[in-house]
Amino acid sequence: MIEMTETDLQRKHTGISEIREIVGIYEIDIEDLKYSPLKIKVIQILNASGDSYIGIANLTIKGKGCSGYYRSMHPQKTKEEALDDAVDGFFAYLSDESEIKVVKNW
């Protein structure tokens, strides 16, 4: 647990705009998926308005008829909700006709 708060760090170092902590990395095996496992990195964002969590997938997906690749990264209140959001966002576009790309420097 970090004892120093974001405000303490920002007072010391004015160039800090955001602090993130990696909460966990989850690997999800998906049947018949060439790029399996789907990996989700859940980070906690520490800021003055309260902590939030974001799930970040190592894969982006382009569904049939979509113009671009997608991965859900909406701030959530809990790490479980962040994991759910990232996985749900991936499966929302997954089909036999989807295109998938691995994210470099994930």
Name what the model sees in each region.
Residues 3-10, 62-106:
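Mixed-charge, Lys/Arg-enriched low-complexity segments
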Residues 44-71:
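Short aromatic-glycine-(Arg/Gly/Cys) micro-motifs in beta-strand/loop hairpins
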Residues 24, 29, 43, 88, ...:
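N-terminal non-cleavable signal-anchor helices
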Residues 24, 33, 51, 67-68, ...:
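Intrinsically disordered, low-complexity segments enriched in small/polar residues
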